Amino acid sequence: EGEFGNFCAGGDIRFFYNAAISGDRDLDTFFTEEYKLNHLIFNYPKPYIAFMDGIVMGGGMGISQGASLRVVTERSKVAMPETNIGLFPDVGGGYFLPKCPGFIGEYLGLTGKVLTGQQALAANLADFAINSDGLANLWAILESKTETAQDKLEKCVQTIRLGSLKKDEGWIDTEIHSTFENEELSTIMRILEKSESDWAKKTYLMLSKRSPLM
């Protein structure tokens, strides 16, 4: 959990650019350490809770998707936006995006679409959605010095369940699966270009501004 309302927006793109141009070896060190951290989180033996409040993008997804419990709020903005700068979803995106229902992962990975907390819940990128005004109480439960770790964890989960919000599936257009089930990007673009639906037109324009590979 970062400061309430700000989880993690990912890496410093300006640093990446300057380091690549100058040949700074710190760039290699950064990615090595980042991926080691992601691997550690995904394999961590103890309960790991990610309070995904606010912006959760790129690297923020890398340190949250391996959590035992992923909690979003009404302020959450969840995305893997790498194609916006001509890159591809990294930090484990190739592992957790395919776990989304149907072909939603392919859609999110290629478009970089930003989801709300309840939309992320529908995409299996979160376990619970709650109102952000309940976060302070959850922290107080976890910081208690009078209960065992197991008791605190169970009480925290129970509190989250009682205040949980419903998932939002309204954004999942029926065309997502029939379009993004295709393995070739050229096929996806051709289908979108020929479609008359508003969703297809918006998605085509969106992809046209993403990675030059598209």
Whereabouts are the PLM-identified features?
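Hydrophobic, secondary-structure "cap" segments at the distal end of domains
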Residues: 94-103
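Amphipathic alpha-helical blocks and their helix-capping loop/short-beta junctions
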Residues: 125-213
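A short acidic, glycine-rich active-site loop
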Residues: 20-30
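Glycine-rich beta-to-alpha active-site loop
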Residues: 41-85, 108, 112, 117
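Terminal peptide-recognition signature
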Residues: 12, 47, 64, 120, ...
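A structural preference for short, pocket-lining loop segments at secondary-structure junctions
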Residues: 1-21, 40-51, 73-76
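Gly/Pro- and small hydrophobic-enriched strand-loop and loop-to-helix capping segments
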Residues: 67-90, 124-138
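Basic (Lys/Arg-enriched) interaction patch that binds polyanionic ligands
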Residues: 106, 110, 114, 118-132
